[in-house]
Amino acid sequence: MLSAVHLTRRFGNRVAVEDATFEIARGEIFALLGPNGAGKTTTLRMLAGLIEPSAGEVHLSGHRVGRGNAERLRARVGLLTEAPGLWDRLTVRENLLTYAWLHGLREPDQAVERSMTTFGLSDRANDAAALLSKGLKQRVALARTLLHNPDIVLLDEPTSGLDPESAREVRELIVKLRIEQRAVVLSTHNLDEVERIATRVAVLRQRMLAVDTPDALRARLFGHRLRVVVTGHAGAFIPALRTGGHPDVVADDNTLSIATRDALRDTPDVVRVLVQHGAAIISVVPEEHSLEDVYLRLIKEEARA
């Protein structure tokens, strides 16, 4: 649906984004991860057609987006900026109506009423934006982002600074957008949030360090391993495991870490070898690596390069 091809953006001599290539499909939550200044917001703004790339292209449904047809892209994209950007003196209804008019909606009043009902804002319709809590302001900003029913939704730090309940509501909305077959691009520092809802992850530090599903990134960086806890000293069983076809084994006190092609499939054979050589097994579990482990390894590898 939406793709970036060798996308680059420079501000003077500073490179904000370099040679980023990726595709975003319908029904996908695509998470952009990276430290501050990595180019996440700049990437979102290029995808939204708000700034032009210094090099590379944005494609929408196979067609290149440029100066002549940027409006076509904007009509199909909803962008939530990190700051809600509401007019404090206007009411909730007036804020939404202003954007309905800017988008040229045919029935702006009806669209705004539907949106306020959907987002639970009807009872705050006549409240000035300045009087709203941060969570409510974010809810209004999300309603505004989706007012023109975009296919592609770009969210810049949508849960930043929100209380846990408000953040949960935003996550539920994002998942609902995926179910509705919209393409969602999410920029965030919240790795737990990404772990919960993202279908694919891109780690960005000016350039793309990796793009894949969380599980595929884990497998690529750490492989598949079994963690086996035994009674006594685990190192005594390393020779038997290597002879039995498991050459990559590490022992630490009473714990073995064993590389496998498929942890679940290889578990019976590992257990068989250990039991045959007298091991008293306490537990056998696949090793789990968090998305934080993936992220930190990629950032460290890039820093060493």
Please annotate each region the language model reported:
Residues 56-66, 72-73:
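Conserved ABC transporter NBD signature motif
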Residues 97, 101-124:
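Conserved ABC ATPase "signature" region
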Residues 153-156:
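Catalytic Walker B motif of ABC-type/P-loop ATPase nucleotide-binding domains
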Residues 48:
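Helix-to-loop junction immediately C-terminal to a conserved catalytic motif
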Residues 149:
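Conserved catalytic motifs of ABC-family nucleotide-binding domains
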Residues 171-261:
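ABC transporter nucleotide-binding domain
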